[in-house]
């Protein structure tokens, strides 16, 4: 049975309380979540040498605000929406109507304001439930949304995230979590190994929007199918990696198992700590971001240490970016009265439990 601990983490200028909720299981895995942005602040994985915190974050609420309200927000650990990733030219059409959004990433719209929301929290059993609403017109999107995020910690060292969103008007939705992982517990992630179960990826343009071409990974630095160190092909002069700051910021099309409710999409491991992580999801894509601009974060990381380039990698399970501009992509439309559901599971292993990547 999971155990819960709640403690104060800060207060908004309006006097609203920011709390930290720590969930732990009998095996020693523990997760810290904030009611601000549904942020995953810490994941402590038990090892023979003691627990290792494998995610990036900040020590104070003020630092999260400083980060998230900057033009180069990292969205560190946050639940992202209304539309995770980009909407090209910050415009889309749904239900026969055209909507203009805030252009917050050049001329495009990126992620939205869910990371800066406060959520009501309930705890029961092994579950942390966070709920909020998004009013019609927020960021320019139509529809009043009811939002539900569940974090479920299991006894076999897995953290499952369930999303449930309903709308009273036709709209679009794309949700993810923007946690940065570092399975070494510090330093850069270039030597950590990663396998992505994807034979294809979305080609990007110089604004990190899909061109519409879905290309094979074979024979390119985008090929993670056999597993390799994250940094092995990161600096080869390949145009797709150079145009995003010398790294990866690309959506991979997951090779889905036939009839599977969740598919294994990624497997990462650290030789230093012996920690491995497998990622399963119901979503069609996973965005790999290797922290190419983390060094620009205006707020310090944990322990006051500045964020560094390649200091973490994100595996953002999601629908494809800019889907409203590409009718050939899986639809992100959410019709009035319908419910969007998706879930992702992170499963952690140590030593030889997981096999060798």
At which residue positions do the language-model features occur?
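An exposed, glycine/acidic-rich loop-and-rim segment of catalytic or binding clefts
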Residues: 2-357
């Amino acid at each position: 049975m999971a155990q819960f601990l709640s403690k104060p983490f800060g207060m908004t200028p309006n006097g609203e309380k920011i709390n930290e909720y720590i969930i732990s299981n009998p095996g020693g895995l523990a997760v810290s979540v904030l009611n601000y942005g549904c942020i995953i602040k810490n994941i402590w994985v038990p090892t023979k040498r003691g627990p290792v915190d494998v995610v990036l974050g900040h020590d104070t609420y003020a630092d999260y605000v400083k980060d998230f309200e900057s033009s180069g927000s990292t969205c560190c650990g946050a639940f992202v929406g209304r539309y995770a990733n980009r909407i090209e030219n910050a415009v889309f059409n749904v239900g026969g109507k055209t909507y203009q959004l805030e252009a917050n990433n050049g001329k495009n719209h990126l992620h939205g304001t869910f990371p800066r929301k406060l959520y009501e929290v309930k705890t029961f059993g092994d579950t942390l439930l966070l709920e909020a609403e998004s009013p019609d017109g927020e960021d320019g999107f139509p529809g009043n949304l009811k939002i539900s995020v569940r974090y479920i910690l299991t006894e076999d060292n897995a953290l499952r995230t369930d999303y449930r969103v309903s709308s009273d008007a036709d709209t679009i939705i794309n949700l993810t979590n923007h946690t940065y992982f570092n399975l070494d517990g510090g330093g850069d992630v270039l030597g950590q190994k990663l396998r992505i179960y994807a034979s294809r990826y979305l080609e990007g343009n110089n604004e990190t929007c899909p061109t519409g071409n879905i290309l094979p990974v074979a024979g390119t630095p985008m090929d993670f199918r056999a597993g390799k160190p994250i940094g092995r092909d990161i600096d080869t002069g390949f145009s797709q990696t150079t145009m995003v700051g010398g790294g990866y910021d690309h959506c991979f099309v997951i090779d889905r198992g036939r009839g599977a409710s969740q598919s294994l999409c990624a497997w990462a491991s650290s030789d230093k700590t012996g920690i491995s992580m497998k990622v399963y999801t119901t979503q069609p894509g996973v965005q790999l971001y290797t922290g190419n601009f983390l060094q620009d974060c205006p707020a310090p990381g944990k322990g006051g240490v500045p964020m560094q380039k390649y200091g973490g990698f994100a595996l953002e399970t999601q629908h494809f970016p800019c889907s409203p501009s590409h009718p050939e992509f899986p639809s992100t439309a959410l019709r009035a009265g319908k419910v969007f559901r998706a879930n992702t599971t992170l499963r952690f292993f140590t030593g030889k439990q997981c096999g060798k990547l």
